[in-house]
Each structure stands twice: as C-alpha cells, then as structure tokens.
Amino acid sequence: MFGGGSPDTGASEDLSGVQFVNGTRSGNTALVELAKTQAGNVGGYPYWSWYGFNSRVEWCACFVSWCYGQAGLSEPRFAACQSQGVAWFTSHGQWGARGYENIAPGDAIFFDWDLDGSADHVGLVIGTDGSRVYTVEGNSGDACKIKSYALDYACIKGYGLMNWN
C-alpha cells in the first residue's frame, strides 16, 4: 500500500557546481531549501509521525506530504504513492509523464522501480540542469538523500506538477 524506498543506498549527492535551468513554470525555492535541510535524517520519524502513524511505515510519501505541509499546503497529502499520490495529481490535471519537459522545483517525482506501471517511490524535484533531474527523497535507504537521475531514466513514472501561483 505504502510507497517503498529507493533501491540506491549511496550517500547524498553534492550539488556544488550544478547549474539549474529555469523553466516557464514557477517553483517554490523555500520548499526546496527546507527539503534539502532534511538530508541525512534517518528513520523518517518526524514525517510518518506528523502524518498520524504510530509506528514506522514506508515513509517516502509522508516526507513529501510533510514538506508540502510545512509550506502551508493542506494538500496534496498522501501516504501511498500510486493509489493516493499519482491519483491526486492525475485527478487534479497536474500530472506530467516521464519526459515532461517543464518540471519545476517543488514538483513531486514518482518512480516505478520494478516497471510494473505502479509508482513505488516519490521524492521532491530540486531542479534540472537540462539532462538530469535532481531530487530530495525520503526513505532512500531509510534516510533523506539528495539524488539525481537522467531525465529519460526508465524508472521515472512521472511528475506531480504543483501550482504555486
């Protein structure tokens, strides 16, 4: 039911020297800066607890929802990637499939690790340099980590497109 973690258990990436490309959609840099400060958190306690769980769950979606909540948003709020997260963005006309070129900082990025058509993991977009997308993800090896992926990476299911206007 819940979103699983990233199979990559490596350390967070160093973003120094990365030049991000600005798209036409505005993002939320304050949300991104908040999410980046969470890198290194292990176990996800503040996120799944904030969501209302009494014990540890797969917490990637709780992390994303917590970040949106800290930005003052009451929704989207989801603990399951496919049945709640993807469903919310799709039903609100705010979904962009893999290859969508106008992602913005603060958008959600959904992954399908086993390529079965169902999202298994979610993170937040920090930005893109035109060839890679940079993310902050909860529950990546049971920790918050900064990661990057080629924009055409097959395991990217799509993006939850936030409307910050």
Where are these regions (language model features)?
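Solvent-exposed, flexible loop/coil residues
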Residues: S49-G52, Q82, H92-G93, S148-C155
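...with weaker cross-activation on analogous glycine-rich loops/strands in unrelated enzymes
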Residues: S74-D142
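Aromatic-residue hotspot detector
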Residues: Y47, F63, F110-F111, Y159
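Aromatic- and glycine-rich peptidoglycan recognition patches
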Residues: P7-F20, G96-R98, A119-N165
